[in-house]
Amino acid sequence: MKFGIEFVPNEPIEKIVKLVKLAEDVGFEYAWITDHYNNKNVYETLALIAEGTETIKLGPGVTNPYVRSPAITASAIATLDELSNGRATLGIGPGDKATFDALGIEWVKPVSTIRDAIAMMRTLLAGEKTESGAQLMGVKAVQEKIPIYMGAQGPMMLKTAGEISDGALINASNPKDFEAAVPLIKEGAEAAGKSIADIDVAAYTCCSIDEDAAAAANAAKIVVAFIAAGSPPPVFERHGLPADTGKKFGELLGKGDFGGAIGAVDDALMEAFSVVGTPDEFIPKIEALGEMGVTQYVAGSPIGPDKEKSIKLLGEVIASF
């Protein structure tokens, strides 16, 4: 099992750099930085992380081809690869409709858009010209091939991830979700003449770890509430939860009733949408994900009640694998 960690660049960048360095020191192999217009710029953040670290692989987790053109992303990730001496990795997904509506961007044909974007970026990163004549001239990646991970959720995206990417970043925390997802990734990989072993299947989890299990759970409840609000009925049915659960949380959060939303998060929702607990409780939960085909565990928001302490505790977990 490989281990990655996610950071949202909404804090001072110096703090994020220190936390990523700590993560590197305790055994994390990947740092994923979210890319959203209302936070600090992902590539400027990554550049400073590259300067402040030595071995950890790093990249956006995830960007999208609507807000950023594939050519701009290719140039940015190649530059990051140079700055980090060959440690760049790229996460790209279809984005979310709510963000595009707010920006006035039309969200059309996500599967074919991602497919075309990855094809263009691979061409540019190889130093070749696209059919339309685009070519990177003043920047060249250190790696012969920068790994490209696809953020994927639905069946078509999961199959496409298996077909054209080096890894799949899946926003899920429960083995049941990977029991459903991994066969679709495998189907896509085999259709392209590859094996599922060629794809790094990453569980991008809602993670909260602490020596106090209750404190860990409490820190994750607001994140679980937002995950529930954005999940479609089939996901709830998979976990034996009422299909209208998402609607209920959407209404609570929509009117700003965060206390009500947190209070409505029960143990069943926590089990479905998060990995929380003490270090001893984490180990079997991560092992269960591995049994379903997960090959990278990503500690996503909130990480824990105290990020620095929680990263150190995750280091204890990593040492068990």
UniProtKB/Swiss-Prot annotation:
Pfam families, sorted: Bac_luciferase
Family in the record: Belongs to the mer family.
GO biological process, any: one-carbon metabolic process
EC number, as in UniProt: 1.5.98.2
pH dependence statement: Optimum pH is 7.0.
Listed InterPro entries: F420-G6PD/mer (IPR050564), Luciferase-like_dom (IPR011251), Luciferase-like_sf (IPR036661), MeH4methanopterin_reductase (IPR019946)
Subcellular location as annotated: Cytoplasm
Coiled coil: none
Keyword list, A-Z: Cytoplasm, Methanogenesis, One-carbon metabolism, Oxidoreductase
Known pathway: One-carbon metabolism; methanogenesis from CO(2); methyl-coenzyme M from 5,10-methylene-5,6,7,8-tetrahydromethanopterin: step 1/2
Protein name: 5,10-methylenetetrahydromethanopterin reductase
Function: Catalyzes the reversible reduction of methylene-H(4)MPT to methyl-H(4)MPT.
Organism for this UniProt entry: Methanothermobacter marburgensis (strain ATCC BAA-927 / DSM 2133 / JCM 14651 / NBRC 100331 / OCM 82 / Marburg)
Transmembrane segments: none
Catalysed reaction equations from the record: 5-methyl-5,6,7,8-tetrahydromethanopterin + oxidized coenzyme F420-(gamma-L-Glu)(n) + H(+) = 5,10-methylenetetrahydromethanopterin + reduced coenzyme F420-(gamma-L-Glu)(n)
Any one of the GO CC terms: cytoplasm
Complex formation: Homotetramer.
Main location: cytoplasm
GO molecular-function term, one example from the UniProt record: coenzyme F420-dependent N5,N10-methenyltetrahydromethanopterin reductase activity
